[in-house]
């Protein structure tokens, strides 16, 4: 029976003859088992070839001699597979764990005829992953098992014997379900259910809740500081620029702005540039944007240094920085490098202008016009200077003299400068009282007066019930007892369809009845 094997010198198959002698049969069976393990180590499935039914007849004399195959232990078969995998690295660039299928090992150990036929089938298709020119020693069966156990992980036997795909699928299914179950368990532990709360098993720790509230309050207070710290750390990564670098970036920005303007004008006129020229113009525009961003990022620290001067005036520090950044963008767009000044000198004025304008528009609860804000700032500056010179608070006349305005105008400006405060503002170190608790409400109704007024209404109603319907109606409309709005005689006459004189007569007659002691006595107590 002939089998083919790839030659080490050439890729052409070379035929060789497999004899059926007893020694060759035993060697062939052993070689077949080792090649089966080697094929498993290289990643190809040898079990299909090893389990094929024997299609050729085998001589009876060679069968008893093949029982030497059954004396090969499983561990030695695995050791041979490990050695073969180490000597024959895969040409495909990947390596897998040595794994011998159970079916191939079982047939190699129990059926010599099938093992011999497996050797013939493997020899017929020599597709072992061996590098050309490299010899694979398949007869090296005497390996040191102690050394092999040191090299292989303790669970190598389990890996070699785990060829059942169903076990792997079960493990994968369990692994897929485990994270979800763990998450559910965590949620149940972290968040007590409504049933637990209702049953009384869940006990709320007051000390812990107070600590959490205090920690949350501290976090809110430090949130702004943390944001500023993170922002300063981020902008500090950009290196500062020298004068030459600023001029170079300014030239690139100018070229980008010019290219953008030119393309916009051509687009408005409906003209189209050639593809190559349009591509160059687009590149110049993008380069100008990159230079603009670089110049901006390198001067963000200038904005922070200027914004520090305006803290404590009604705007948060981060808001001042953002408004200053808008002024910095404006300065980058209008910077003229031909003047010979540094960019920071020019940008400072734009940053200050943006910050002061934002404070005038956003810092106050009630917005004040920008020109009045400038007057208020000037008055405050003069007031501080006079305080240092005189050692006392200046009078309105002294302020008016310095500002060249009237004292009345100074008082008016000082009224505008006042800022409203919240009635919910806390008072004291403990913060348990609010400002509104100490301010009297002059329009609030006193409880005693409210009760007295209610009793007076009841007494008036009882007295008016003793009069006729027209008389009681005229009195109610004349004195506004119903809605608090008194009516004239003409208005009452229009209501009843009579003249104003008739309404006057009814009023006079009704008042005489009300002055009778039987009616007026119950109302005299409310005159005090």
Curated annotation (Swiss-Prot):
Region of interest called Disordered, as start-end residue ranges on this chain: 1-211
UniProt keywords, alphabetically: Cytoplasm, DNA-binding, Sigma factor, Transcription, Transcription regulation
InterPro entries noted in UniProt: RNA_pol_sigma-70_dom, RNA_pol_sigma70, RNA_pol_sigma70_r1_2, RNA_pol_sigma70_r2, RNA_pol_sigma70_r3, RNA_pol_sigma70_r4, RNA_pol_sigma_r2, RNA_pol_sigma_r3/r4-like
UniProt-listed GO biological process terms: DNA-templated transcription initiation; response to water
Induction: Constitutively expressed under all conditions tested except for 3-fold reduction in stationary phase, standing culture and upon growth in H(2)O. 2-fold induced by starvation. Half-life of over 40 minutes.
UniProt keyword Membrane, yes or no: no
GO molecular function, one term: sigma factor activity
Region (Sigma-70 factor domain-2): 295-365
Region annotated Sigma-70 factor domain-1, chain positions: 225-259
Pfam families (alphabetical): Sigma70_r1_2, Sigma70_r2, Sigma70_r3, Sigma70_r4
Stretches the record annotates as Sigma-70 factor domain-3: 374-450
UniProt motif (Interaction with polymerase core subunit RpoC) ranges: 319-322
Family listed: Belongs to the sigma-70 factor family. RpoD/SigA subfamily.
Function: Sigma factors are initiation factors that promote the attachment of RNA polymerase to specific initiation sites and are then released. This sigma factor is the primary sigma factor during exponential growth.
HAMAP family: Sigma70_RpoD_SigA
Protein name from the UniProt record: RNA polymerase sigma factor SigA
């Amino acid at each position: 029976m002939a089998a083919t094997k790839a030659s080490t010198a050439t890729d052409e198959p070379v035929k060789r003859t497999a004899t059926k002698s007893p020694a060759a049969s035993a060697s062939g069976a052993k070689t077949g088992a080792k090649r089966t393990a080697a094929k498993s180590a290289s990643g190809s499935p040898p079990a299909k070839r090893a389990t094929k039914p024997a299609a050729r007849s085998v001589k009876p004399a060679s069968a008893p001699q093949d029982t030497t195959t059954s004396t090969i232990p499983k561990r030695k078969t695995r050791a041979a597979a490990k050695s073969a995998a180490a000597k024959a690295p895969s040409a495909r660039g990947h390596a897998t764990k040595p794994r011998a299928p159970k079916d191939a090992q079982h047939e190699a150990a129990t059926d010599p005829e099938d093992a011999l036929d497996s050797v013939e089938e493997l020899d017929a298709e020599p597709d072992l992953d061996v590098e050309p020119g490299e010899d694979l020693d398949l007869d090296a069966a005497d390996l040191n098992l102690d050394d092999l156990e040191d090299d292989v992980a303790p669970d190598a036997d389990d890996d070699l014997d785990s060829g059942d795909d169903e076990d792997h699928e079960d493990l994968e299914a369990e692994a897929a379900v485990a994270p979800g179950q763990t998450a559910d368990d965590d949620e149940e532990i972290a968040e007590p259910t409504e049933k637990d709360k209702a049953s009384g098993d869940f006990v709320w720790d007051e000390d812990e809740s107070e600590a959490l509230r205090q920690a949350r309050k501290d976090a809110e207070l430090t949130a702004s500081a943390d944001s500023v710290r993170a922002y300063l750390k981020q902008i500090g990564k950009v290196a500062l620029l020298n004068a030459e670098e600023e001029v170079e970036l300014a030239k690139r920005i100018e070229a980008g702005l010019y290219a953008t303007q030119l393309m916009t004008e051509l687009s408005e006129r409906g003209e189209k540039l050639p593809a190559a020229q349009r591509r160059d113009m687009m590149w110049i525009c993008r380069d100008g944007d990159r230079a603009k961003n670089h110049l901006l990022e390198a001067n963000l620290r200038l904005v922070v240094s200027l914004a520090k001067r305006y803290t404590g005036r009604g705007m948060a520090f981060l808001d001042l920085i953002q408004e200053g950044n808008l002024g910095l963008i404006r300065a980058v767009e209008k910077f003229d490098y031909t003047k010979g000044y540094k960019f920071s000198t020019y940008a400072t004025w734009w940053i200050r202008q943006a910050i002061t304008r934002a404070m005038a528009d956003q810092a106050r609860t009630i917005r004040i016009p920008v020109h009045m804000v400038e007057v208020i700032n000037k008055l405050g500056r003069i007031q501080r200077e006079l305080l240092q010179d005189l050692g006392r608070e200046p009078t309105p006349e002294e302020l008016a003299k310095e500002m060249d305005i009237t004292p009345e105008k100074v008082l008016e400006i000082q009224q505008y400068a006042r800022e409203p405060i919240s009635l919910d503002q806390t008072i004291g170190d403990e913060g348990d009282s609010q400002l509104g608790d100490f301010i009297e409400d002059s329009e609030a109704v006193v409880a005693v007066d409210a009760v007295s007024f209610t009793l007076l209404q009841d007494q008036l109603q009882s007295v008016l019930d003793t009069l006729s319907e027209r008389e009681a109606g005229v009195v109610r409309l004349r004195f506004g007892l119903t809605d608090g709005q008194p009516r004239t005689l003409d208005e009452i006459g229009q209501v009843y369809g009579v003249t104003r004189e008739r309404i006057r007569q009814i009023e006079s007659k009704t008042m005489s009845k009300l002055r009778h002691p039987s009616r007026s006595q119950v109302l005299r107590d409310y005159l005090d």
